[in-house]
Amino acid sequence: GMNTDYPGGQISAGAPGVVDTVCDGFNGTAVASGATSYNMLCGTGRLGIDLMQLVIAPTFAMKINKDHSLGVSPLIGYQRFKAKGLDGFQGFTPSPGTFATNNNLTNNGYDSSHGFGLRLGWMGRLSDSVTLGAAYSTKMRMSKFSQYKDLFAGRGAFDMPENFNLGIAVKATPAL
């Protein structure tokens, strides 16, 4: 997972309704609503995100001979995400309307998504002292984060990427 949380108020907005800050033209919404300060990304209030990911991988493995084995795992994925304080980006979103009436960008609490993938693996003993392993996991196509469709490319898409793994085990001495 990933979690960040920063306090708001690092950038002064001057008098309410007066456009005179480093965030000028970036976040007119906060000035219009009477904000007196911004966070580091020209939004209002605290700034942060929270992403949690869980992958369940029930595995079937079998030896194909005395030195090699193969495994397969269906992957079941679950994600939870929330963002806060990103209202400074509202002007850059594809959603029409004002931030107050059409918010699929920030401050919506937790949203979740799920998806599926596959992992294949191999392990082989090359000698009495060297064993290699390799695995490949497909991209996990996840359902979209509908509450944050203006934040992510693909209107809320946040897939888990494919990945490759390699490993080597070396037995330094027969005593180990």
Regions found by a protein language model. Name each.
Residues 1-176:
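Outer-membrane beta-barrel porins/channels
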